[in-house]
Each structure stands twice: as structure tokens, then as C-alpha cells.
UniProtKB/Swiss-Prot annotation:
A motif (Histidine box-2) lies at residues 157-161. This is Stearoyl-CoA desaturase. It is an enzyme of class 1 (oxidoreductase). One of its GO terms (molecular function) is stearoyl-CoA 9-desaturase activity. It is a multi-pass membrane protein.
């Protein structure tokens, strides 16, 4: 489809928005660790059917020391072995056939989109709707990524938004870079994560047969899609050596996808600008967006979690938005939620850090 026609298709499907002016409060954490209250406004009610990913300013951490960390040694050992295998895969890259490298890159893109367009923007935030063929594709691609099943991923992510930067946030960035990057997967969840996560309304995903099917058969699914298939195809189809197939196409590719996603939780909460809301931790981080196919515009995303682009700028360093728009042009995605420019500019004027550049 010509670019101008695709652009018309994109514009024609945006959801009409309604402005509301009810303010609430938000906690501001500044560089010195001081906490203060600052107004937060919800500009548009463009996704009235779900509110469990909207920040809850009333929740506060309980006073007193955190519970002692309980290490999950199985995860520590498996993650260590995976990354050792990935390092060996880097050494093997010069000995790989070009088809193997292309295969690994394609598998990385597919699995990344399964997380970003699937688990994140579709199932966690309901920022757009997808017809059955697209949902099937996204469930398969998400299984290729092996980052917990969609139900668990979405539950943790909704808790991350609703209770951001508190003990009920599964990967609370106030606990440091390592914890928010991978450490949270190596220890037992904080009791507040279990308590508050268990209270979230997950009825939409419980009613989604594909999501429940994936959850039921997740272990054999990830064994096949994340490990066996990416290893067997290069070895069988074009005669790649088995070590290159295993360590490059599987271990290295999987480790890259994992770390690209983790950087959204760590680097994009610590490094970058906050043009939309300086009162929250998430930042705009272009490097993260490159690796995570469009998920690095994190200050925007936490300010407007109901926007299907997770960014103001649609396709700018945002392969996921491009993918969703292409699916919309094919009739497979629809009802894409998009925040109006007026609402964005109004929010920037109220809470931005003055780093905003229109474009």
C-alpha cells in the first residue's frame, strides 16, 4: 500500500477523545530522595474500559525495613548459564553462516514484537484491538520470547504502572539498576507485589481463550518455540554447525531480547529526559527504544499508558507502532487509542521538565 494511503488509513481509525479536568495527586521523588505531593491530571478518557494500569497515588509503602531477600537459586543458575552461553555465542559469530545470523535477527524481531505489540500494548494496556489471526500470531511470537506467559506478564506490568516506584512495583527502580533490570527475577517477590497484584482486575485476560491456552501449555510451548525451533532450523535447513545454531541463534538471541526488555525497566527509569512529566521516574531513552523496538519513550508511556504508540511520534524509532499500523491497514488491528496533540501540549506545560522539542 502506498505510504500516503497507509497514512490516511492510520488517521481515519483514531479514537475520538474526551477531555476531563479532574486532578489527583502524585508523589514526586527528586534527586535528594525527598518526597512531595504534586498535582496529576488525567487529560482524556479514551479507554474507559480499563483503569488498573493507571497510577494510584493513594498507595504508600509500609514503614519499616523490607523483608529479607529470598534468593531463587534456580533462576540465578539458569540466568548465569544463559548469559555464559550468550557470551560464547558472540565468539562464534564470525564462524556462522549468513543465513544463521539473519535467522537469529528475524527471530529476535518476531519475539520482541510478541512482547511489545502483544503482551504489552495489546494485553497489558488494551491500547488497541486485534482480530483472531493477529492475536494468534502475537501469542506465538510472545511464546518465542519466553518472558513469562502473557497473563503473568500483564499482571506484573499493570502492577508496575499502578504502584510505580513502590514495593508493590515488581521491578521497583528505586531499589537500583540491577534489581530493576534482572535482580527482581532472581529473588522472591516482595509481599506487597503479591498482595496488590492479586487485587488487580484480570477478568479481561481470564476471558481470553488464547491467553489461557498459552498459560496452560506454556512450558512445552517455550521449550519448542524459544529453544528447539531456533536451534533446529539452521542446523537442518542450511547445514549450520550445531554449536553455532545453539549458542548464536538460540542463547545469544534470547539473551539480547531479554536484556532489551529489561532495559525498559532499568535504564529507561534512570537515564534520559522527562519532557511530559518530571514528577515520575520514567525517562525518554532513545537507545532503549532502538533495542526494544519502540519502548524507550518511557516518560510518555507512563504519562499516557493508554496510547497505542507508547510515544508521541508514531513511527519514530518505533517498529512496534509501525507493525500495529501495518496490521491496521490489513484490517487485523483496529480501535487504536491515541492521545490528542492538545492534551499532550497541555500536560507538557503543566508537568514537563522543559526539555520538550516539538517534532
Amino acid at each position: 500500500m502506498p505510504a500516503h494511503l497507509l497514512q490516511e488509513e492510520i488517521s481515519s481509525s483514531y479514537t475520538t477523545t474526551t477531555t476531563i479536568t479532574a486532578p489527583s495527586s502524585r508523589v514526586l521523588q527528586n534527586g535528594g530522595g525527598k518526597l512531595e505531593k504534586t498535582p496529576q491530571y488525567v487529560e482524556e478518557d479514551i479507554r474507559p474500559e480499563m483503569k488498573d494500569d493507571i497510577y494510584d497515588p493513594t498507595y504508600q509503602d509500609k514503614e519499616g525495613p523490607r523483608p529479607k531477600l529470598e534468593y531463587v537459586w534456580r533462576n540465578i543458575i539458569l540466568m548465569s548459564l544463559l548469559h555464559l552461553g550468550a557470551l560464547y555465542g558472540i565468539i562464534l559469530i564470525p564462524t556462522c553462516k549468513i543465513y544463521t545470523l539473519l535467522w537469529a535477527f528475524a527471530y529476535y524481531l518476531l519475539s520482541a514484537v510478541g512482547v511489545t505489540a502483544g503482551a504489552h500494548r495489546l494485553w497489558s494496556h488494551r491500547t488497541y484491538k486485534a482480530r483472531l489471526p493477529l492475536r494468534v500470531f502475537l501469542i506465538i511470537a510472545n511464546t518465542m520470547a519466553f518472558q513469562n506467559d502473557v497473563y503473568e506478564w500483564a499482571r506484573d506490568h499493570r502492577a508496575h504502572h499502578k504502584f510505580s516506584e513502590t514495593d508493590a512495583d515488581p521491578h521497583n527502580s528505586r531499589r537500583g539498576f540491577f534489581f530493576s533490570h534482572v535482580g527482581w527475577l532472581l529473588v522472591r517477590k516482595h509481599p506487597a507485589v503479591k498482595e496488590k497484584g492479586g487485587l488487580l482486575n484480570m477478568s479481561d485476560l481470564k476471558a481470553e481463550k488464547l491467553v489461557m491456552f498459552q498459560r496452560r501449555y506454556y512450558k512445552p510451548g517455550i521449550l519448542l518455540m524459544c529453544f528447539i525451533l531456533p536451534t533446529i532450523v539452521p542446523w537442518y535447513c542450511w547445514g549450520e554447525a550445531f554449536p553455532q545454531s545453539l549458542f548464536v541463534a538460540t542463547f545469544l538471541r534470547y539473551a539480547i531480547v531479554l536484556n532489551a526488555t529489561w532495559l525498559v525497566n532499568s535504564a529507561a527509569h534512570l537515564y534520559g529526559y522527562r519532557p511530559y512529566d518530571k514528577t515520575i521516574s520514567p525517562r525518554e531513552n532513545i537507545l532503549v527504544s532502538l533495542g526494544a523496538v519502540g519502548e524507550g519513550f518511557h516518560n510518555y508511556h507512563h504519562t499516557f499508558p493508554y496510547d497505542y504508540s507508547a510515544s508521541e511520534y508514531r513511527w519514530h524509532i518505533n517498529l512496534t507502532t509501525f507493525f500495529i499500523d501495518c496490521m491496521a491497514a490489513l484490517g487485523l488491528a483496529y480501535d487504536r487509542k491515541k492521545v490528542s496533540k492538545a492534551a499532550i501540549l497541555a500536560r507538557i506545560k503543566r508537568t514537563g521538565d522543559e526539555s520538550y522539542k516539538s517534532g
